[in-house]
């Protein structure tokens, strides 16, 4: 899986965290691991321009998704495996997201993780134009965010335990001499 991040927003964000959440969602949604994803972070002026150009809507927005190759299951069982596919582009606006995060009472990192999930789901064909679609997409988005956060917490605790174990082993070696 290749995920490229280009931060043109002027705001310092954790690219590693964005890649982590995108990888997690792509794996959970059973997308071919050879798929490629591009993420671009823009300032509000550039996002407003993109929003007007592609959606004909004024002002910036939080996230936009631009799907590339259609990744549908199926095909003949004896057909060769397709090569790497370009999932698409996700464009995020951290400045806009920061305002949303403050209004929601959580961190910018949390908001950007949520928006990354939202963007990946759009690339996979999910939409929220109709009430039923919105209910399905937002429930899936919330579940994936919850699972990713739990995964991150577990990894953090495992890392801390490994560090404690390493220090304990180092101390025991000191006393063995």
From Swiss-Prot:
One term under GO cellular component: cytoplasm
Compartments where found: Cytoplasm
The record's free-text note on cofactor binding: Binds 1 zinc ion.
Source superkingdom: Bacteria
Single Gene Ontology BP annotation: rRNA processing
PROSITE patterns: UPF0054 (PS01306)
A GO MF term: zinc ion binding
Required co-factors: Zn(2+)
HAMAP family recorded: Endoribonucl_YbeY
Name of the protein this chain belongs to: Endoribonuclease YbeY
Organism name: Mycolicibacterium paratuberculosis (strain ATCC BAA-968 / K-10) (Mycobacterium paratuberculosis)
């Amino acid at each position: 899986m290749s995920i490229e991040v280009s931060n043109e927003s002027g705001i310092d964000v954790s690219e590693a965290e964005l890649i982590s959440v995108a990888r997690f969602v792509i794996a959970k949604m059973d997308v071919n691991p050879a798929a490629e994803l591009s993420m671009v972070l823009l300032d509000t002026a550039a996002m407003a321009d993109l929003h007007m150009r592609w959606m004909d809507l004024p002002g910036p927005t939080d996230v936009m998704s631009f799907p590339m190759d259609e990744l549908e299951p199926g095909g003949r069982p004896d057909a060769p495996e397709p090569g790497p596919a370009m999932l698409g582009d996700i464009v995020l606006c951290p400045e806009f997201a920061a305002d949303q995060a403050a209004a929601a009472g959580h961190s910018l990192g949390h908001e950007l993780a949520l928006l990354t999930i939202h963007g990946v789901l759009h690339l996979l064909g999910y939409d929220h134009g109709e009430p039923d679609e919105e209910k399905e997409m937002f429930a899936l988005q919330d579940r994936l965010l919850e699972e990713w956060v739990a995964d991150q917490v577990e990894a953090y605790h495992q890392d801390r335990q490994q560090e404690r174990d390493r220090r304990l082993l180092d101390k025991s070696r000191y006393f063995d001499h």
